[in-house]
C-alpha cells in the first residue's frame, strides 16, 4: 500500500492532497473496499491479500487493532475530488501506472495462501478476502480416516424382536445372526417391555413435550429415578438422554464448580469420561490401567485438602477387564478423594439385583460416591443416569447444561426402562443364560485356536491385530456366513490390538448358534491367515484362558 501511495502521489489529486497519516490509517478495509470498485486499482489488491494484512475487521493490523478513520469519502472531500460515487474514479488513469507496478510485486512463499483458501474469487466480494474451501477440507479429513483404516462403515442391521438373535439387512427377506449387540440380555425384545411401551404410547403419545423444566417432567421420570436410586442404594438418581451425556455433564459440572478440582482418570476410560474431564478445564492426571500402585503414588503427591475425583469403569468394554473397585475406594478415603464409577457395561448383568460389579461385594455400593449407568444395554432401551447423594444429584440437576437444555426422554422409553430394571431386580434367568452362552463361546473358540482376550466377564474380544484384516474378517463373516460381528479399530482400541468384539446373549445359548459362530470364525481365520492363540502368546498377551462362568444346559428355543 505504501508503494502505491508513493508512485501515485505525483499524479493523483486524491493521493497528493490527502493527509499521509490519514491514508495510513485507511490502509485497510475502507480503502480496499473503495479500491475494489475501481477497474484499475482492484487488480493490485490480491497482492495486498497475499501479504496477510488484516483488512476484514476494520483494523489496521493483526498486532495492533486500531479503528480506521476517516472514510474514503471524507478524504475525497478534503482533497477537492468530486464524483467519487461513480464506478470509475476520475483519477484512475493517473494511478494506473502505480497499480500496474504493484501487481508485479513478487509474493514470497511464506505469504502464499493456504491450500484451503480459494484463489479464484470470481469477482465476488472484496478482492482481498480469501475463501476457505470447506469441501476440500472435509475430504482431506476423511482421506486421513481411509488411509489409517479407521473410517467407519455402517451395516444396515435390523434386529427382529420376535426372532432375536436374527436380523435382516436392507432386504427384509434376508436373515443374519447378530453377535455384537449391546442388548446384552435381549430385553429390547422382551414381551413384558414391549407391552409396557405400547400401552404407554397409547395413553401418553410418542414424545416428551419438552425439557424436564418445561413440560417434560412427569410421573414416568419420577418412578424411574426412584427405581434407579433404589437399585444402587443411593438417596437419589437423575436420568439423562444417554450415559455419554450423563458422564460428560456430571464430570464437567463437578470440575467447573469444585474449587481447584483435579481428576485422576484411568487410561482406558471411555470417551464420554475423557470428554467430560476435558470440558471441565480442570487439571487431570492419568493413571495406569487398574494400577493401584500408580494411582496411590499420584494421589499421595496431591494436597489432602484439594478436591479430587477418581474416575474409572467397572467393566471395560473392549477388554472385559474388571476394576479393583474396593481397593480404589480405600485409596479415595485415605487421600480425600471421591469416586466416580461407570457401571455401563455391568448394570443388569452383575450383582444379585443387577446393580453392577459393586453390588457383588457386600457393603461396597455405599462406598462409591457416584455411580453412572445406562438404560441402553442390558435394559434394552435408551438413556443414561447417575446415582449419588441427594445434594450432589440436585446440584447436577440445577447446574449441568447437558441436563437442563435438552428434551426429556419420551414417556414410553422411561416406562420400558423402568419395566426392565424392575424385572432384572428379581429375575436371574437372563443373567444365567447369558453367562452360559459366554462360557460356551469362549471355550469353543479356544479349542480351535481363536485368540480371545482372557477375562471373566461377558465380553469376548477375538484379537486380530490389524485394522484392514479386522475389516476383511468382519465383512467375510457377514457376506459369506450371515454372521454379523463388527470390527473394532483405532481410536476405540489402540493400533495393533484391533479385534472383533463378540457379545453372546441368552438367545445365543443354543448348540446351533455356538457351532455356527465357531465354524465361521475358523473359516475366516484360515482364509486371511490371522494369528491364532500361539501367535498372541508369543507377544505376551493373555489369550485363551477360560472364564469362570458356569455352564447351563443349552436352551432349545431362540
Curated annotation (Swiss-Prot):
GO terms for biological process: heme biosynthetic process; protoporphyrinogen IX biosynthetic process. It comes from the Eukaryota. The active site is at 377. Keywords: Acyltransferase, Heme biosynthesis, Mitochondrion, Pyridoxal phosphate, Transferase, Transit peptide. It is an enzyme of class 2 (transferase). Residues 103-124 are annotated as: Disordered. Homodimer. Belongs to the class-II pyridoxal-phosphate-dependent aminotransferase family. This is 5-aminolevulinate synthase, mitochondrial. It comes from Schizosaccharomyces pombe (strain 972 / ATCC 24843). The gene is hem1.
